[in-house]
Amino acid sequence: MSKNYHIAVLPGDGIGPEVMAQALKVMDAVRSRFDMRITTSRYDVGGIAIDNHGHPLPKATVEGCEQADAILFGSVGGPKWENLPPESQPERGALLPLRKHFKLFSNLRPAKLYQGLEAFCPLRADIAANGFDILCVRELTGGIYFGQPKGREGSGQYEKAFDTEVYHRFEIERIARIAFESARKRRRKVTSIDKANVLQSSILWREIVNDVAKAYPDVELAHMYIDNATMQLIKDPSQFDVLLCSNLFGDILSDECAMITGSMGMLPSASLNEQEFGLYEPAGGSAPDIAGKNIANPIAQILSLALLLRYSLDADEAATAIEQAINRALEEGVRTSDLARGAAAVSTDEMGDIIARYVAEGV
């Protein structure tokens, strides 16, 4: 008998509810084709939660997420709530507390150049023609953003500011394991990013990654300095499979990876804890300027569902079916307006219908 799964669905603001509706269509197709028992509960988060409950992350939403196997998150924020105190705004008051509450230490950001979308890549045509499919694995809770001491002191010519890069062995070990396990589901290559020629934290990082790699003899490991990595991503992104990064370096490289794909509407994201409980969301924002127009690209939200199936539900076959359905739609020239470039475009609803149908049919 198949296991019962429960997903907390948090559509949020802006285009969030529209693109989430398409992901739920695809979830229905997955249920039917793979005989998976998946139930969902919907909760307010972000600006809509402020309007309805007076807080961007209501207690009922947190409690609902605690009862779920994973969180499928839309997007939060918009001009309506920009003048609130920073800690009460949708982004800071909802997403960051959720990450902290569930101890989500790893961030996974796929960046893929899909066949037929090479013209959107800002790289040279001969580089884009090779394509790329990269997974950036970023450590989220350690490093220079959180290390102590940090602050400012002194005055005049002696005023100074300081931050501290701190990593513990256990933090590096667990994010490295995520990267190697992910590589086993892909092309079996990890490139670990550091600055071990200068930084003590990077020397420790490299030593521990080498130790973890011994448990994964089937996965190729390479090390690369961060400055070289930023250049190699421009020169030949096809050389990379999984990038393993500290918090700071991952922040930089994941955005660079996103930019060279040419479309934020195609980029999902996953944040996981040690139990592989995860929060899955599009990498883009709430896009309030196009909300309600039925023109938003839902693919990033649908791919976030695929990540959820793969990492939190261990349903790799279902995740692959979604990815293949999206590939098929794009290869057939199906485009939302952000990808159409003057050609005929389908609506948000139509793109969701097509992908759900292709999942149900199989490719």
UniProtKB/Swiss-Prot annotation:
Looking up InterPro entries in the UniProt record yields:
IsoCit/isopropylmalate_DH_CS, IsoPropMal-DH-like_dom, Isopropylmalate_DH
The gene designation is leuB
The role this protein plays is:
Catalyzes the oxidation of 3-carboxy-2-hydroxy-4-methylpentanoate (3-isopropylmalate) to 3-carboxy-4-methyl-2-oxopentanoate. The product decarboxylates to 4-methyl-2 oxopentanoate.
Annotated residues for binding of Mg(2+): 227, 251, 255
**Predominant cellular place of this UniProt entry's protein:** cytoplasm
**Localization:** Cytoplasm
| Residues that hold NAD(+) according to the record | 78-91, 285-297
Q: Which GO terms describe its biological process?
A: L-leucine biosynthetic process
Q: How does it assemble?
A: Homodimer.
Q: What is the cofactor note? A: Binds 1 Mg(2+) or Mn(2+) ion per subunit.
The UniProt record gives the binding positions of substrate as: 99, 109, 138, 227
Q: Which UniProt keywords apply?
A: Amino-acid biosynthesis, Branched-chain amino acid biosynthesis, Cytoplasm, Leucine biosynthesis, Magnesium, Manganese, Metal-binding, NAD, Oxidoreductase
What cofactor does this one take?
Mg(2+); Mn(2+)
Protein name according to UniProt: 3-isopropylmalate dehydrogenase
- Give the Gene Ontology MF terms in alphabetical order: 3-isopropylmalate dehydrogenase activity; magnesium ion binding; NAD binding
